[in-house]
UniProtKB/Swiss-Prot annotation:
Protein name, per record: S-adenosylmethionine synthase
Species: Psychromonas ingrahamii (strain DSM 17664 / CCUG 51855 / 37)
Pathway(s) this gene product operates in, as recorded in its UniProt entry: Amino-acid biosynthesis; S-adenosyl-L-methionine biosynthesis; S-adenosyl-L-methionine from L-methionine: step 1/1
Residues given in the record as ATP binding sites: 15, 164-166, 230-231, 239, 245-246, 262, 266
Binding of K(+), residues: 43
Binding site for L-methionine: 56, 99, 239, 270
Co-factor: note: Binds 2 divalent ions per subunit. Binds 1 potassium ion per subunit.
GO MF term set: ATP binding; magnesium ion binding; methionine adenosyltransferase activity
Enzyme class: transferase
Binding positions for Mg(2+) per the UniProt entry: 17
Keyword Magnesium in annotation: yes
Keyword DNA damage included in the entry's annotation: no
Length: 382
């Protein structure tokens, strides 16, 4: 048996970069609740005792940036200086400006269907049938591990846990099929008073075993739990955090290509975000319809232009119909113009803060995960 290994990582909601992402998206959500036509590009920087919120925002809404920031940090769990960051005492700097009118004139149109892209760029969407959520297994289970860490921290099952954590899972494949998990890494911030051996046992029993399927674990599986032996200093004290620095964690864990644009803090007129969601929607429906076992979609745009400059499909030799037919079906059933995809996926709603931790894809509560095009694609293909 040949064994190919593939690894993906995730980070918890208390990781500094994810704190920044969640603040940026919390600001976006608050504005969208009041102004559906707002233009938002909100960036956040966090470091010891300080949060700086900046970017370009054009809106008629008024939101309390300080209150939004403190509530977000508090809900993550940073509530005392003992753990290195305190929602109630950190300094908050607001350096937000307005979006350039040069961009506005290229995006806004009298006919909204002709709305231009907010920038040039290329975006990818991906799906695979190796999990029931049509996502690669390594990133899926890496997310599950850090999500479980947050759960047992917040419900006090493991009260000595702190918000910052990272996971990494290496899967073994034989000719593209999962045959096991080769390695698991989980590093979690903790209080001073927990012994390393007690931490290792508790993490194994309360986080790893409840999450990872037993049939994929064996005596060959390697476990690395807090491998440095100590992780007391974490969060923004340990590292500064910036919006948009976890773009592979946010997407497919390296299993698919990435156009380079981050998501958090951007309203749906920014195709970096909305077109990446639409490309995932297209790829997932193609795989769910049985047109391919794996599918990667690339779309590209020019600033101020409505129609995509390109649509391409990669199926890695797993297609069940010709790729030309798949592209034809995409053009028939999916409107990938900026306004079209916003309408198609109902993107102008305050749903974005919850995307900002544990991945933007493979979570069925989001509209771009719907499988409502499957029957139409089947009818057109077979």
């Amino acid at each position: 048996m040949s064994r190919d290994l593939f690894t993906s990582e995730s980070v918890s909601e208390g990781h500094p970069d994810k704190i920044a992402d969640q603040i940026s998206d919390a600001v976006l959500d608050a504005i969208l609740k009041q102004d559906k036509k707002a233009r938002v590009a909100c960036e956040t920087y966090v470091k010891t005792g300080m949060v700086m919120v900046g970017g370009e925002i054009t809106t008629d809404a008024w939101v309390d940036i300080e209150e939004i920031t403190r509530n977000t940090v508090r809900n993550i769990g940073y509530t005392s200086s003992e753990m290195g960051f305190d929602a109630d005492s950190c300094a908050i700097l607001n350096v937000i400006g307005k979006q350039s009118p040069d961009i506005n004139q290229g995006v806004d149109r009298s006919d909204p269907r002709e709305q231009g892209a907010g920038d040039q760029g290329l975006m990818f969407g991906y799906a695979t049938n190796e999990t029931d959520v049509f996502m690669p297994a390594p990133i899926t289970y890496a997310h599950h591990l850090v999500k479980r860490q947050a759960k047992v921290r917040k419900n006090k099952t493991l009260p000595w846990l702190r918000p910052d954590a990272k996971s990494q899972v290496t899967f073994a494949y034989d000719h593209g099929k999962i045959v096991g998990i080769d390695a698991v890494v989980l590093s979690t911030q903790h209080s001073e008073d927990i012994k390393q051996e007690d931490l290792v046992e508790a993490v194994m029993e309360e986080i790893i075993k409840p999450v990872l399927p037993a049939e994929w674990l064996s005596e060959r599986t390697k476990y690395f739990i807090n491998p440095t032996g100590r992780f007391v200093i974490g969060g923004p004290v340990g590292d500064c955090g910036l919006t948009g620095r976890k773009i592979i964690v946010d997407t497919y864990g390296g299993s698919a290509r990435h156009g380079g644009g981050a998501f958090s803090g951007k309203d749906p007129s920014k195709v970096d975000r909305s077109a990446a969601y639409a490309a995932r929607y297209v790829a997932k429906n193609i795989v769910a319809a049985g047109l391919a076992d794996r599918c990667e979609i690339q779309v590209s745009y020019a600033i101020g232009v409505a129609e995509p400059t390109s649509i391409s499909v990669e199926t890695f030799g797993t297609e069940k119909v010709k790729k030309d037919l798949i592209i034809q079906l995409i053009r028939e059933h999916f409107d990938l113009r900026p306004y079209g995809l916003i309408e198609m996926l109902n993107l102008i709603q305050p749903i974005y803060q919850s995307t900002a931790a544990y991945g933007h894809f493979g979570r069925n509560e989001f509209p771009w995960e719907a499988l409502d095009k499957v029957e139409a694609l089947k009818a057109g293909a077979f």
